[in-house]
Design a protein with these regions (language model features):
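Charged, helix-rich terminal subdomains or tails
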Residues: 1-173
Length: 173
């Protein structure tokens, strides 16, 4: 017999009743257990009929979450994007608005027009060629454009960006 561990992680408003938080994380845990082999994590989106139709709950096996989401996508973003609390002259500036816009374009990736919008957004981020952040920009442009075109990598990148956004959100947001 193999022991498996499934988890549901939800982020709620501080005024949300504990019973509602428990219900929501229970639904997330059930979503994680629906993965083949269980042993998974589901986070953020609460699966329900009332939820936004285009939003999907992030659900991964632990290995994929640790290696692909955190180990690759999140680590890459932390290294090359400069956001609140993670600024450096050699990082590409990406404020909260840019991160949200990026996340929305990744979420709406149904056709070529959105790929063009994503490429345009990346192009608008280009710093001057003599900027210390230019090398970071080149790496970000190449990686994010490639990840956008792969469904699994795009979902992993969305989760990594959500983790960053939740980290930099201010109280009350």
């Amino acid at each position: 017999n193999k022991l498996s561990f499934s988890a549901g992680i939800g982020i709620f408003d501080s005024k949300c009743p504990i019973s509602e938080m428990a219900r929501g994380t229970g639904l997330l845990e059930s979503t994680a257990k629906d993965n083949p082999g269980k042993d998974s994590i589901a986070m953020f989106g609460i699966p329900s009929a009332e939820s936004h139709a285009s939003y999907t709950t992030a659900s991964y096996g632990w290995e994929e979450f640790v290696q692909q989401v955190c180990g690759e996508k999140l680590t890459f973003c932390q290294r090359y994007l400069g956001y609140a609390g993670n600024e450096a002259v050699d990082r590409l500036p990406a404020g909260k608005g840019v991160l949200y816009r990026m996340l929305n374009l990744l979420n709406e990736s149904r056709d070529n027009i959105n790929l063009a919008r994503f490429a345009y957004m990346l192009g608008r981020m280009e710093p001057p060629k003599d900027s210390p952040a230019y090398d970071s920009y080149a790496k970000v442009r190449e990686k994010l454009y490639g990840w956008y075109q792969d469904k699994a990598a795009r979902k992993q990148l969305m989760t990594a960006l959500e983790l960053i956004i939740y980290r930099i959100r201010e109280k009350g947001e």
